[in-house]
Amino acid sequence: MESDKIVDLKDVSIFQKNSLILSKVSIEIQSGEFVYLIGKTGSGKSSLLKTLYAELSVIDGQAIVAGYNLLNIKQKEVPFLRRKIGIVFQDFQLLTDRSVDDNLMFVMKATEWSDKAKMDARLHEVLKMVGLATKGHKMPHQLSGGEQQRICIARSLINNPKLLLADEPTGNLDPETSAGIMMLLLEISKSGSAVMMATHNYNLIKQYPGRILKCSNGKVMEIPADLSGNFTSSFTPGFQTDDIDDETDKGSNEPLPDKAGY
């Protein structure tokens, strides 16, 4: 249904300063879809994420994200768009001098929550969703890497986002912890939020199939599923294993907006 379309890009050009990074980008993402974004470092993955987040301006084509027209969005509207988008980074970006509760409260205050009872209720709700209901009093350094990433996911869920952008969310985690994060992200998509995850980890794509978008040679193409619905390295000439590095790959060096735009 049209109303379920969270991302609708048609013939969009994506620039970094004066350099054309991706041309004629056409993407549709529906509510509840899980979409991988792959491609070599520097291929434009982070530039695409920045465009969806209105960090990079759209100057042509059609670009509707979470109900906002990015072609003519006003600067004062950008914070409201970003409240409908959650972002999860590879390197956590938690406030190290504040407790878990205070990290989440910081986001609530920055996005104009004011009712203390509602804030407390939502804080406990998102912590329970990520399996850390008893960790609110902890400082970030007292948590494992996987727990810190779960807190980042909880932070991204505070405003019930329509779209979750995950930029290498498992890049610093061991395989077992990565699996837990993947299961959580998949549960989020099943609950109705669209999820787009940039990754270099081929093993995750094999284990947790989803749609695949590939950035390559200035274009974004969709890699189709085979008849069984699984993705492999050999079913299509569009998917090459050199597009996916091993788990030690740290992903793109193009940063997304600091502090998730708050």
Where would I find each of the regions flagged by the language model?
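Conserved ABC transporter NBD signature motif
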Residues: 61-69
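ABC ATPase NBD coupling module
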Residues: 70-86, 188-190
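Conserved ABC ATPase signature
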Residues: 139-143, 147
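A short, proline-enriched helix->beta-strand linker immediately N-terminal to the Walker B motif
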Residues: 158-162
